Amino acid sequence: MTEDDVEGGTWDGERLATTACERCPALVESRSQIVNGTGPTDADLVFVGEAPGASEDEQGEPFVGRSGQVLDEELRDVGLDRADVRITNTVRCRPPENRDPHVEERENCRAYLAREIAAIEPSLVITLGKVPSEHLLGRDVGVTAEAGEIFEATIGEETWPVMICVHPAATLYDPSQGEAFTETLRAAADYAGDGGQSTLGEY
């Protein structure tokens, strides 16, 4: 196992996982465990959410609650499969009472996300919702208006194409967001080429 220190935490370069971190006292207090990204380490598409919720904190995987079910369903609808994409979060620990992660907390976790993306070398990074979009792009984002658009973002020492997408939870509260969500996922699959991964054409 290859581990090294990253800004106060410990990073496992083989598993692409944060194995220890206590940089954010409030998150250390509220979390049950660190929730790392899941999916292939050579995925063409990397989805970045906001932070773990209650289900994710309990199970130790991102997007396993209702939002994750919506994401899985829509991925299948556009010819993708969860097993062939990487899913991770801006912040790896559950914020108390499911609040948005503070700016400092996002910055504390940025080095982990940068290393994860750099190791995977995806064709495209897709930000799910306002928090990850604004964090990676460094500006205010109108998610609904900009959904499906691609911008360049410097993450760590490298620059990656980033596509803005509405958060799957938004489709639960506002069904009118559903079409934009589906079309953005379809555009992401097309951008990555041949359904995002060579195996995805079977779905």
Describe the role of every protein-language-model region:
Residues 2-203:
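A polyanion-binding, active-site-adjacent surface
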